[in-house]
Amino acid sequence: MHPFLSRSFCALATAASLIALPTLGAELDPQPIKPELQRLIDQMYPSMRSVYEDLHANPELGFQETRTAAKLATEMRKLGFEVTEGIGKTGLVAIYRNGTGPTVMVRTELDALPMEEKTGLPYASKAKAQYNGKESFVTHSCGHDMHMTSWLGTAQALLGMKDQWKGTLMFVAQPSEETVTGAKAMLADGLFKKFGKPDYAFALHTGSMPYGTVGYVAGAATSNSDSLDITFHGRGSHGSMPDKGIDPVLMASRFVVDVQGVISREKDPMEFGVVTVGAFNAGSAGNIIPDQARLLGTIRSYKSEVRSKMHEGIERTAKAEAAMAGAPAPEIKLIKGSDAVVNDAALVGRTVKLFKTALGDKNVIPIPPATASEDFSDFINQGVPSMFYILGVYDPKKVAEASQPGGKPLPFNHSPFFAPDPEPTFKTGVQTMTLAVMNVMQ
């Protein structure tokens, strides 16, 4: 996942899920159970803090999360869950049956990012791993370590209050969310065929909000995510004799600029859409015109029609650059990634009402959809009413200071300095997720 609460939020999306909610029982009143839930959370926190620091110090990249998955599997078995490992390569599924009732899925991610941590924390990651053929630092700078710890804490809290809900818990630990391929891998491995399709699903994600708060969207919460991989073919020559060759660097450079015309002149300016070229690879020396140049980039959108228009424009622009240079047609790969996460409006409404009673109205905040992407949508798209919400991580005073004119922005997800405040973040994460699950299991 990527920064959910950056300053680049766009207009609120209005699309909403059309999935019909299964018949629900009475809504949960959180007030009578809050003291018991808080006692359970306070009691588990010291041990969960140790788990958090261990996960943070030992991150693993997507589809390499063997140690991480094994640790979560061990913890869930201690609680009495039936655990199956190796779903989607390194994913795991933990099941707990507690009478007749709905099946509710709670998702966490396992993977970290290929970057160096710079938080200075005593438990900061120093881990390294192979990434794209090179050694890279690895760190949990997207908050997945907190997601996993809250996931474990929620499981423990639910079992501590199992006399107050009925049904089946389906806790899913997903690999490789950062590449938006892990959910697909689990589904391809028969996740819902082997364990049944859940009636509801929930997931949370850390964001740069004050701790003690949560953010929500009723409808599209994240963007569609696709990638581009384009290779322009030229004809190599000496740098002093450009007329003897066909310069692919010039073609690729023109494309990087011209493709933005698809955004500014072809897409409805009121609709969100982004094309970003993040990697430009060509040549080996300054005095050689290479024979090819390769571009890698990302394509983001909310609506399917905008997505299609951008794909068409990208392909047309790339072909035009090559034709203008008298070069062969470029190799164009537009790779569909994840769809936008679209929260079920009815489930969001029910859950937000509960959150406001538990946390207070001012701490449950409607937010715009993120321009970032998430493959939680792959689970939702199987016909599962779901809610994906944001969990605040920072001292409210620091957030207020950062929002003032001239204030220093706080690090957001994917920053090497991203460091949630563990205790209040964990406690709010467990409280809200436990209540959300119980609210559909009455």
Residue ranges of each PLM-predicted region?
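Histidine/acidic-residue-rich, glycine-tolerant segments that coordinate divalent metal ions
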Residues: V93, K128-T139, D145-M146, L158-F280, ...
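Acidic/His- and Gly-rich active-site-bordering loop/insert found
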Residues: L28-H140, T149-G153, A157-K166
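Bacterial N-terminal signal peptides that target proteins for export
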Residues: M1-L12
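Short, flexible, mixed-charge acidic loops at enzyme active sites
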Residues: E117-K128, G219-S223, A400-P411
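Bacterial N-terminal signal peptides
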Residues: C10-P22
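Metal-dependent amide/peptide-bond hydrolase catalytic core
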Residues: A26-L28, S253-Q442
